[in-house]
């Protein structure tokens, strides 16, 4: 499941924020395309959504209780071992400036800023790894 998500994420990143014309012309599933204006980098590279999903999955598979601090620790670990783009400036700065040994720093730097996005929803697919509903609700 995680592999398929990462492949779809890497394929789809080309079309995020792209013009309708670009999407119509290039979304043919024949291979990865460059983003509009992109020269060579970025083909086949997954985004922040996959990276944070890996952090969620690693926490859930560890068997440790799920807390904000533990999520922050796993998000930081995932980012620090393989930094990549896709994050908002504010979140990327918090990831760069925070130490995984002190995840509370990351939580303090990422308090909600009054805007909504679909980022958190994109990162919840790893919850599908939990086999029973009661455990999902508990976590």
Regions found by a protein language model. Give the residues of each.
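Structured, active/binding-site neighborhoods that engage oxygen-rich ligands
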Residues: 1-139
